Amino acid sequence: MDNVLHLIFGNHPKSGTIKSRAEVILRFLKVRVDWVALDDIEKEINISRQDNPSMFYKPLSALKKWRLVDSVRRATGKTRQGNNTYTTYYKWTPERFLVYLRDTLHAKCETELKMFK
């Protein structure tokens, strides 16, 4: 897990806290096989989305970018005014991460080799 997190977040001294939060999120999603609500993730890492949105969403954003987690937004109810309320769900997708890694690495190396000639 350390190599994957190092690949995603790098080795910047300030990335340590983000890596630890991302690791907690990944372990939680790996145990829960199906889609997990954002509220459950919030309880697991013990950081409020309203109080500290950047601390909460930075690890999720990076994990989504690298396709280690997938997200879907579903309508879960209606307000009194008749508007839909939505909940975001996340799921651990290691197979999509490997495909993303293979495709981007191949494209990057191919581009550099063409420039080298």
Regions found by a protein language model. Name each.
Residues 1-28:
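Short alpha-helical segments that sit at the start of domains
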Residues 72-87:
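Short, Lys/Arg-rich nucleic-acid/phosphate-binding segment
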Residues 86-117:
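Short, amphipathic alpha-helical interaction segments positioned at domain boundaries
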Residues 16-24, 36, 51-58:
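Short, well-structured alpha-helical interface segments that form or flank functional binding sites
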Residues 28, 44, 59-62:
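Alpha-helical recognition domains of nuclear gene-regulatory proteins
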Residues 49-66, 71:
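Short amphipathic alpha-helical interaction segments
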Residues 34-46:
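Short acidic, hydrophobic short linear motifs in intrinsically disordered regions
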Residues 29-33:
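Short helix-to-turn junction characteristic of helix-turn-helix DNA-binding domains
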